Amino acid sequence: MTLQRRTSSLSETHAAGRELATLLEPGDIILLSGQLGAGKTALTQGIAAGLGVSERVTSPTFTLVRQHACSVESGITTLHHADVYRTNSLDEIEDLALHELVEQGGVAIIEWGEMAAPLLGAAAWRIRFEVIDDEVRDIIIDESSVGTRLDGVREWTSK
């Protein structure tokens, strides 16, 4: 089963990310999927803001992974933001050691997460974007992927 939240603008997607950040815990991995321009980076920017990241967050398409320090108040040390679009194999994704990055109290968000799902799927939140029109997006979360935070995610999707 899935849960869904619709956003109607970039600012609403950012706000949804800020709110979602309050549900995250150290060690979480989030796999984001959706077509180009669907809102993966926008949601990540909102999550980063919610975690107290002070620097600008952009898609790490050419660097593959970027680290951003989070505020102490968030309880999360680092946001590891990955984009595996330009990888060519599961071996290349595995070499990024994304699962190890979160072991020190961080959170990892992986754009084009469907490519990493065979390696991380069981241990990761799965969030998919559907483009409805130029501005409107459906953010769809696989409810089996959020574990004990299902009630919080249900509340998040009801907004």
Which sequence ranges carry the predicted segments?
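N-terminal pre-Walker A segment at the start of P-loop NTPase domains
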Residues: 1-19
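Short phosphate-coordinating micro-motif centered on Lys-Gly-acidic
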Residues: 3-4, 91, 99-159
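Phosphate-binding P-loop
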Residues: 21-27
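Hydrophobic anchor at the beta1->P-loop junction of P-loop NTPases
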Residues: 30-32
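P-loop (Walker A) phosphate-binding loop of NTP-binding proteins
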Residues: 35
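Conserved lysine of the Walker
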Residues: 40
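Short beta-strand-centered segment that lines the nucleotide-binding/catalytic pocket of NTP-utilizing
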Residues: 53-68
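Conserved nucleotide-sensing/catalytic segment adjacent to the nucleotide-binding pocket
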Residues: 56, 69-112
